[in-house]
């Protein structure tokens, strides 16, 4: 099962505001776990789209720092690591917007960015044996996107 999270179109690298989201590959045997996993994978695959663009421009991503409420889900974090085949670091404070505001105020008061220490809660390492599976699955997800785009009336 695959999910296209195009509630208001898709951003980079597709830049198509007309595409709409949906689930693909649903059968009568699918359950909530399949749909949830498909939604998680779609976020991971969107991230992979961006990291592949960076790689094409000679910017190699060996690790990624993540934040936000979704990072409280360990399954998602490991899935992202497996999908990207990169280390995923999660800080103890997952609310980076508030932390960013604090950092800006500290800099305004004369503190250096070097004075601010990031405390990591977890580092997720990729399961290298899953690389082939996630690469094939990612390419299938991209195929669903391209098929959906090709069906949009001009």
Which residues fall in each region the model found?
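Glycine/Thr-rich phosphate-binding loops that ligate phosphate moieties of nucleotide
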Residues: 1-154
């Amino acid at each position: 099962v695959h999910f296209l999270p195009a509630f208001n179109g898709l951003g980079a690298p597709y830049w198509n505001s007309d595409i709409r989201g949906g689930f693909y590959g649903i059968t009568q045997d699918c359950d909530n776990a399949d749909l949830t996993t498909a939604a998680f994978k779609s976020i991971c695959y969107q991230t992979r789209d961006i990291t592949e663009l960076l790689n094409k421009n000679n910017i190699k991503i060996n690790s990624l720092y993540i934040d936000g409420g979704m990072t409280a889900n360990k399954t998602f974090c490991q899935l992202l690591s497996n999908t990207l085949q990169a280390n995923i670091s999660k800080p103890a404070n997952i609310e980076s917007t508030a932390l960013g505001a604090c950092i800006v105020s500290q800099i305004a008061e004369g503190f250096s960015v070097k004075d601010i220490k990031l405390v990591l809660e977890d580092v997720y390492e990729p399961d290298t044996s899953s690389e082939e599976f996630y690469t094939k699955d990612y390419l299938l997800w991209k195929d669903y996107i391209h098929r959906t785009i090709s069906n949009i009336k001009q």
